[in-house]
Amino acid sequence: HKRWLAFYTGLVLLFAGLACMGGAALWWLWPASACLLLAAAYAGLGAQALQKQADGRHSAAVAVWLLPYFIVVRLNMAYWLRGVPQSVAVAENVHVGSILAAAEFAAVVDVCAEYPLFRRPEHYAAVPMLDMVPPECADLIRAVRLLEQMRRAGRPVLVCCALGYGRSAAVVLLSVPVGALPSK
């Protein structure tokens, strides 16, 4: 957490410094305050600081507050996911991938705290976890149980985070027996 706390604190200072120029530069206070909220999340408030709701969206206040950050996150996802599938099947009815692939599924377990889900599928559960830090065991267990519940209903389930490489993969690896994973 310390590295991300330092990173977002550094951005707060940078953007606040730019805002000191006054005039139109005062707009830099918006991304500065967004980074301040992110720093607070990594300082100990956790994923709940980002206020992702049960419908996959953030509270209205946080959605406006974090808009500059959402734009950067979306650009980052586009960069890292260029030329690769947004989701892949890893076991029967279990897919892992980016939150951007959620619109293709009727069942989604969303572990992405930092980016909203714009179109909620019929069967949806959010277990928001912070990016780039070890997930809490209780959150992983909750996400695995939700995945199993949706999977038992016989529908394909997407477990997603921002890119589909970390948090979502951890949930899937905890839920799928090793023998059920593809060999390649």
What is each of the regions a protein language model found here?
Residues 48-50, 101, 168-170:
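Short, electropositive, low-hydrophobicity segments enriched in small/polar residues
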Residues 59-62, 168, 183:
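Secondary-structure junction/capping motif
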Residues 74-159, 177-184:
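Cysteine-based protein phosphatase catalytic domain of the PTP/DSP
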Residues 68, 173-176:
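Generic low-polarity alpha-helical segments
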Residues 154-173:
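A phosphate-binding catalytic loop at a beta-strand-loop-alpha-helix junction
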Residues 1-80:
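N-terminal membrane-anchoring alpha-helices
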